[in-house]
Amino acid sequence: MIRKLAALIVAAAALQACAVSDRLSYVGQTPPMTPIQNPADLAGTGPSQLPMPMPRMPQQRYATNSTANNSLWTANSPTFFGDPRADQVGDIVTVNIAISDSAQLNNTTNRSRSSAEDSDLTSFLGADLTGFFNDNIDPTSMTSLGSTSSLAGSGSVNRTESISLTVAALVTQVLPNGNLVIAGRQEVRVNNEVRELLITGIARPQDIGSDNTIAHTQIAEARISYGGRGHLSDAQRPRYGQELYDILMPF
């Protein structure tokens, strides 16, 4: 048991050491910004494997109507000059993120239970046992068991979140049914703090507006992360020793 606990402490310390080394790398400097990368290489944004219908035939990006060669209007374009909406790998689509959520929960639990058991041993198979025991034992009260348990708990959650952002995402994959897998990242550095926004998900081409924008509520399997790194984020985090203590302390 002691060896397992020691191994757990060493593993947790190794993980914390990696995080500490990253923070030590820019002591006295502003936190570095990551270079431009392929959004498909971000964690969790690889090729998606989802239940799909039969693949559709690929459509031309700017199809023309062969039966009306003299017409200036194309059959598959919602605008007069063409369709600016993203529909191929590498295209860019603008995602409007407007989150305004609130949740309020109140839970109360009360439980109590008691039990009692008494037994005597004054006779056995018709034989009187009152004289079998010495004077220190009362055969009318051989065993007496009792238990009492109670539980009282309460919990409440009152949370309000509001985020309003706009980020450009890249189409990283076109699924067989035509849906688009998108991924985007945006970094903004202000003084010694880097704010990072990540978004991934699956969008329908029909939900993309004529201005090539889509709301985050129309993205399936959406993963939105808004955080940062720097001096302010470090000040809000507990010390790694305290984190280890909270993880390993069983009481």
Curated annotation (Swiss-Prot):
Tagged with keyword Hydrolase: no
One Pfam family of this chain: FlgH
Residue positions of covalent lipid attachment, annotated as N-palmitoyl cysteine: 18
PANTHER family registered for this protein in UniProt: FLAGELLAR L-RING PROTEIN
Subunit structure: The basal body constitutes a major portion of the flagellar organelle and consists of four rings (L,P,S, and M) mounted on a central rod.
GO molecular function, one term: cytoskeletal motor activity
UniProt keyword Cell wall biogenesis/degradation, yes or no: no
Record's keyword terms, sorted: Bacterial flagellum, Cell outer membrane, Lipoprotein, Membrane, Palmitate, Signal
Protein name: Flagellar L-ring protein
Similarity remark: Belongs to the FlgH family.
One GO term describing the cellular component: cell outer membrane
Lipid attachment points (S-diacylglycerol cysteine): 18
NCBIfam families the record matches: PRK00249.1-5
Taxonomic placement: Bacteria, Pseudomonadati, Pseudomonadota, Alphaproteobacteria, Maricaulales
Signal peptide, first to last residue: 1-17
Function in brief: Assembles around the rod to form the L-ring and probably protects the motor/basal body from shearing forces during rotation.
